[in-house]
């Protein structure tokens, strides 16, 4: 996967993402425009994959290359030929089929044989000396679980001690969705070509891609002139959204935020949302909650303004606020329902999370000034489907949420997806497994709410908030690891993250001082 620390990624990964079907249609056009053949593109792909293998595993002396019966297999034949040419021992296993190979793959296969290479059946006993496996079985056209013979090869590769380099995409991972309906290669490195595919960034991608590498195959000039439907957002882009503040700015310039929630026993949720909003730069934060929570919240975070939630305090606060966040610890009893009914007609930007989403699923409506932030379980309730259906196509489900509920939808998870009308779609390339703990969603709500108050558009606030949230966790993970990370731990790094001009300066200075 891409580098999720604050360091610059050592491998250049683009921020544009293409559906695999669009790449397949576009690569022929690109080749024609640039005077290339598709076979020349295959040779470039094989060369790029070979270089990744050599760079990552310079001491590997016996490569096992697994070739499928398609153009992904053609790339594998090129890798095998290049490895053999430099004296590496290569064992190549090929999947046979009654169908002829695509023209380009057939040429690559012929070149391998002409170079003295041999092709073995896929069911042979693997040599004991194999110390690198190259996965070129299945490409980006896969739509379902691999068939049994390929699944057996995948399982064998995964159980073998040799590292695996996947060509274009790990076999068994769906390029459009990141779903894994059957067996899937667990790669240590993946080299993908021409453009990033969404399935490399969301769903199960992080479990199976390893370190992600990219090569445009020389199509940069053509790619630069194309519009893409999906964007990858990462920590490097925070400076695009979060500019240095004017020296004369005051607290009123940075947003007046009201946060509503914290029913009996859930004061922690509303406290985390409130502090996250402050740490993300909100000018003023008012919390409306149960009276029993007032003293503990003020003691824990005196910068918050904390009031009992009543109809009068809610009415006055809605008039005062620039932004409303509702849901953390709200509950689904009458207390929370009445507050949500009052907030529904708020005309300014608002964010609904947690129990607000569970209540929304019962009484759905469409609001264009609202950001919703469901995890897969909440998204399933909002769309009336199963969690498995949500996870099978996260991008499509995020778009469905926008179609049904309006505004901006943030479908949380590894490779969070952010969608907005009419066709804005982003994948968040930040965050880690340490965030799989209680309270992380409450912190995210506060961050996005704060950015809404700082005049970012709902879509930009959602994208920037998710990136800042994940990047703060990545700093912690790089230092302490992912196990045992708490939501409140993010506060120690969040302030750094939302001031990217300081972060960039510190990074540049440390880079310049390095020996």
UniProtKB/Swiss-Prot annotation:
Region (NADPHX 1): 71-75, 139-145
Cofactor note: Binds 1 potassium ion per subunit.
The organism of origin for this protein: Escherichia coli (strain K12)
Protein name: Bifunctional NAD(P)H-hydrate repair enzyme Nnr
Domain YjeF C-terminal: 234-501
Stored PROSITE patterns: YJEF_C_1 (PS01049), YJEF_C_2 (PS01050), YJEF_C_3 (PS51383), YJEF_N (PS51385)
Protein's job: Bifunctional enzyme that catalyzes the epimerization of the S- and R-forms of NAD(P)HX and the dehydration of the S-form of NAD(P)HX at the expense of ADP, which is converted to AMP. This allows the repair of both epimers of NAD(P)HX, a damaged form of NAD(P)H that is a result of enzymatic or heat-dependent hydration.
Gene3D superfamilies assigned to the protein according to its UniProt record, in alphabetical order: 3.40.1190.20, YjeF N-terminal domain
Biological processes per GO annotation: metabolite repair; nicotinamide nucleotide metabolic process
